[in-house]
């Protein structure tokens, strides 16, 4: 091998010498006669095998340079000869020899490698509507079917076309946006074997067909000197090949700083933020700032205006004449608009510079963030004549204050003050009204009700002073009795623009003098008829009022009490509880869905709240609102519910308040949404799938037991342990048909349970679940007790269930149709859940923490009977009340462990002070639930964003004495039993 190479070198040297001699014997070539350099071997293509030698010789009279190019990469040599001793696949490419005149010759070399048919250049990019080259040149030109193939056998798009070149690769024609992220291989058949290249993923750069979309965070800013100015420009385009900048109007100098932040949002959406800031704005920074962006298609811009003032301001604009005339008994609204920066912190209306009124609304002129204009409306209703005067609106912020005054005059019908006296031969009529009344006199012979003959000019005096500067004007008019020569009636008539009134005076001649006979106007037949009609009308109104008051009125169930002298208590008026406006949530961020429950005056609607927890997050919530038919009482009740919920705070086992809308529209209360509805119907749905190890059959056992008499029998050896009640329908363990029977009409969420929710809770119900529900409700009630809150309507229908089988105590209030709910019995002026109420609540109208404990015992009976109604088959009548009073209680439900029935019996103790507290109940149930359930609940409580508030120990009992503050009437007096 070495000898062969030496011979080759010798021949190469001889060839060079011959060329030199030939060149020296020929005339030199002029620069204009330069020829192409010649390459040996004289071929356009050369095929070698991997490991072979590549030897290329370039001859030219002058200097030559070799250039090797493959996949866009270049390498150079200045020797006339290019030698590669052991060729590799990567030596495949175009070899070019260039002389000093710039003329060149090329040869393409294929290095055949069975292991490497394709040379690969990644990544693969393509521009929309242009051609793109898939760089996969071949190392062996003698293959067949050189083309593109989809990954994993997937077909290529039907409209994709390409052109194959073994030396360059495969060119895809007219790239489309739909090809983005297309996976493909270069493929070929080499000696009957199908070969694939490495995987290419085509990334398409979208063609720019429109100008960028430009927007700013706010279109105008108003600042005080020294405040920070910060505005963000958002540029949207299909790719990052967009330029952007902030420009100040008139190129004024400013100390503004800019910061850029960009990201891709999807495949063909590019976003860039240009944030402009001035840390301490000055008056001369005021002006117009333009955000400018451009791409290859064109440019776009948007502006924002900055106004910097040296200090804050308030400008008031009355929206009506400041002098207002209104008739007696009518309404008027005093409306002002005002501009204020910074935001106003104090607004007030003052009457006659001494008393304030709160019958006003204040709201922004628009929802725009840049809004500085506000509207304030004072509502004056059914104005009386004495309520005229000055009404001054005061508004202030941290810098200035301002005010505007309205002069309100109340137009009143004239009132005759004096008309039936003769003084020194003069008859006087005194009238008061506004505007100033006019008085006319009329005379008619005899005793008449009205006169038609006017009396000539009379002496009329106007009293300059009035009751108040804005009160009635008093007018005096006198007439000489010598004007009248005969017996008769004199009528005084006073009138103004509002109305008129009159009074008459009767006199008769007696000798040479006149004397008054009587002032007959009060007892005329017309007046008598009017008085009778008015009396009948009053009686009718009183009857209607009585009937209205006898109707069951809505009352907030949850009551907050305050302790006095340690034991006795009174209810706190919920309207006096504070409301923190931090709960306010914008109405326009609520999207309402289906109605979850409805009552006579209110309803609960499923809604989506945007930005309630996070600025860009959507959350499903429940919104309680009033129907248009609601009265003032119901509106106040809903506001009271809101105040009670905000006062209580958050706990995992109550339906927590999330927000509210009280400004600019009807009141909306936003609470947590519980997807599984109320616990009562959940239990009834799960009857068929309930798993319980306790299989005792209670179908043949009496339902009621006289607990009081049973205690006495243990002492007195009495054999009268049970009472033969024989209810109309005996208790039978529910059959499958019974279990499928619809529960209660109007139940919250039951009729709207979606398949998605049902699929999400396919697990069966077991005894551990019932114990967990008992435990959670006791925890929630312990929390309410720690807040001095009495529920008054604790039942399974008022317990909601959400994900993780977490129970939450609620009060449906206005949203429950208690009128059509048989669980609520009409007593007095309320509908009450009698079967869940403690004896002291039924007979003495006493509601305490202990009465809630009784209701909790009834709830446990519902729970462990899987949603059966308490006291089944028994109507609420005098017999029912008598049994409760005599100590009869329900026996253990079908699925209740003995320990849970013991808790029920202690909850139903006739002596309220012997019943356990909710804190003690929690401790009792805690011993029965499994460690895993307790552990899961503890973890949920710790991970919950609403942590439990520390409980207050109610071991010191509040005395079970009814508060005089309670408006609820006793259900049944002792004599009715």
UniProtKB/Swiss-Prot annotation:
One of its GO terms (cellular component) is receptor complex. Residues 1-25 form the signal peptide. Residues 590-938 form the Protein kinase domain. It is a single-pass type I membrane protein. ATP binds at residues 597-604, 624, 672-678, 797. The chain crosses the membrane at residues 526-546. This is Mast/stem cell growth factor receptor Kit. It comes from Bos taurus. The gene is KIT.
């Amino acid at each position: 091998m070495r000898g062969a190479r030496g011979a080759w070198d010798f021949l190469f040297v001889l060839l060079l010498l011959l060329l030199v001699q030939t060149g020296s014997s020929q005339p030199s070539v002029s620069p204009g006669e330069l020829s192409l350099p010649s390459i040996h071997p004289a071929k356009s293509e050369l095929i070698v095998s991997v490991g072979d030698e590549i030897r290329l010789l370039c001859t030219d009279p002058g200097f030559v340079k070799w250039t090797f190019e493959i996949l866009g990469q270049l390498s150079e040599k200045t020797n006339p000869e290019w030698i590669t001793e052991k060729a590799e696949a990567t030596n495949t490419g175009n070899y070019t020899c260039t002389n000093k005149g710039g003329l060149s010759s090329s040869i393409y070399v294929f290095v055949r490698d069975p292991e490497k048919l394709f040379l690969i250049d990644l990544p693969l990019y393509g521009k929309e509507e242009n051609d793109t080259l898939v760089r996969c040149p071949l190392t062996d030109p003698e293959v067949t079917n050189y083309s593109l193939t989809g990954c994993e056998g997937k077909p290529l798009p039907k409209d994709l076309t390409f052109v194959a070149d073994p030396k360059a690769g495969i060119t895809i024609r007219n790239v489309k946006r739909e090809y983005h992220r297309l996976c493909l291989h270069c493929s070929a058949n080499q000696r009957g074997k199908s070969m694939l290249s490495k995987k290419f993923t085509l990334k398409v750069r979208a063609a720019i067909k429109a100008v960028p979309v430009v927007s700013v965070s706010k279109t105008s800013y108003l600042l005080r000197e020294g405040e920070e100015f910060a505005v963000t420009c958002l540029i949207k385009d299909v790719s990052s090949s967009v330029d952007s900048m902030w420009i100040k109007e008139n190129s004024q100098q400013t100390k503004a700083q800019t910061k850029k932040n960009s990201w891709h949002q999807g495949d063909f959406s590019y976003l860039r933020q240009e944030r402009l800031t001035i840390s301490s704005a000055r008056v001369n920074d005021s002006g117009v700032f333009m955000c400018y962006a451009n791409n290859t298609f064109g440019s776009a811009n948007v502006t924002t205006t900055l106004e910097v003032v040296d200090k804050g301001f308030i400008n008031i604009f009355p929206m009506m004449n400041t002098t207002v005339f209104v008739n007696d008994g009518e309404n008027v609204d005093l409306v002002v608009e005002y501009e204020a920066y910074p935001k106003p912190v104090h607004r007030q209306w003052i009457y006659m510079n001494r008393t304030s009124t709160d019958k006003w609304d204040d709201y922004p002129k628009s929802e725009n963030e840049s809004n500085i204009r506000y509207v304030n409306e004072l509502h004056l209703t059914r104005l009386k004549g004495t309520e005229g005067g000055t009404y001054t609106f005061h508004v202030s912020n941290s810098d200035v204050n301002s005010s505007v005054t309205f002069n309100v005059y109340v137009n009143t019908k004239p009132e005759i003050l004096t008309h039936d006296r003769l003084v020194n031969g003069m008859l006087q009529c005194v009238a008061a009204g506004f505007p100033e009344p006019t008085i006319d006199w009329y005379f008619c012979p005899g005793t008449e009700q009205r006169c038609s003959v006017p009396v000539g000019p009379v002496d009329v005096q106007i009293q300059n002073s009035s009751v108040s500067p804005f009160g009635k004007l008093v007018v005096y008019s006198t007439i000489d009795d010598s004007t009248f020569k005969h017996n008769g009636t004199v009528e005084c008539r006073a009138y103004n623009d509002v109305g008129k009134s009159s009074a008459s005076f009767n006199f008769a001649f007696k000798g040479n003098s006149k004397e008054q006979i009587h002032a007959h106007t009060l007892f005329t037949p017309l007046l008598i008829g009017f008085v009778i009609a008015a009396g009948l009308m009053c009686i009718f109104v009183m009857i209607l009022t009585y009937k209205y008051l006898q109707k069951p009125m809505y009352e907030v169930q949850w009551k907050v009490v305050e302790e006095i002298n340690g034991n006795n208590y009174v209810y706190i008026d919920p309207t006096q509880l504070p409301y923190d406006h931090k709960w306010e949530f914008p109405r326009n961020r609520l999207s309402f869905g289906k109605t979850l429950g409805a009552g006579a005056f209110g309803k609960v609607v499923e809604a989506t709240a945007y930005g309630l927890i996070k600025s860009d997050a959507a959350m499903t919530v429940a919104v309680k609102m009033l129907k248009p038919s609601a009265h003032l009482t119901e509106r106040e009740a809903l506001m009271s519910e809101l105040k009670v919920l905000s006062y209580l705070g958050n706990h995992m086992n109550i339906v927590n308040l999330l927000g509210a809308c009280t400004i600019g529209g009807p009141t909306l209360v936003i609470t947590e949404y519980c997807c599984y509805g109320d616990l009562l119907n959940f239990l009834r749905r799960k009857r068929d799938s309930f798993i319980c190890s306790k299989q005792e059959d209670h179908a043949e056992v009496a339902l009621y037991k006289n607990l009081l008499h049973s205690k006495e029998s243990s002492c007195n050896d009495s054999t009268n342990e049970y009472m033969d009640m024989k209810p109309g329908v005996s208790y039978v363990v529910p059959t499958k048909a019974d279990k499928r029977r619809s529960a209660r009409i109007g139940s919250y969420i039951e009729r709207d349970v979606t398949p998605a929710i049902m699929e999400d809770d396919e697990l069966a119900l077991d005894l551990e679940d019932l114990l967990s529900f008992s435990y959670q409700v006791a925890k929630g009630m312990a929390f309410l007790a720690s807040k001095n809150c009495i529920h008054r309507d604790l039942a399974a229908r008022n317990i909601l269930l959400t994900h993780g089988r977490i129970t939450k105590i609620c009060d449906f209030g206005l949203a429950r149709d208690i009128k059509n709910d048989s669980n609520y019995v009409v007593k007095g002026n309320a509908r009450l859940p009698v079967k869940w109420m403690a004896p002291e609540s039924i007979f003495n109208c006493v509601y305490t923490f202990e009465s809630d404990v009784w209701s909790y015992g009834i709830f446990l009976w519902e729970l462990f009977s899987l949603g059966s109604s308490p006291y089944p088959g028994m109507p609420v009548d005098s017999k029912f009340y008598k049994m409760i009073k005599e100590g009869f209680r329900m026996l253990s439900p079908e699925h209740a462990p003995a320990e849970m029935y013991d808790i029920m019996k202690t909850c139903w103790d006739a002596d309220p002070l012997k019943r356990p507290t909710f804190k003690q109940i929690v401790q009792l149930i805690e011993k029965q639930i499994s460690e895993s359930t307790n552990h899961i609940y503890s973890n949920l409580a710790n991970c919950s964003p609403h942590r439990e508030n520390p409980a207050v120990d109610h071991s010191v009992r509040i005395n079970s004495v009814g508060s005089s503050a309670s408006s609820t009437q006793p259900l049944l007096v002792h004599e009715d039993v």
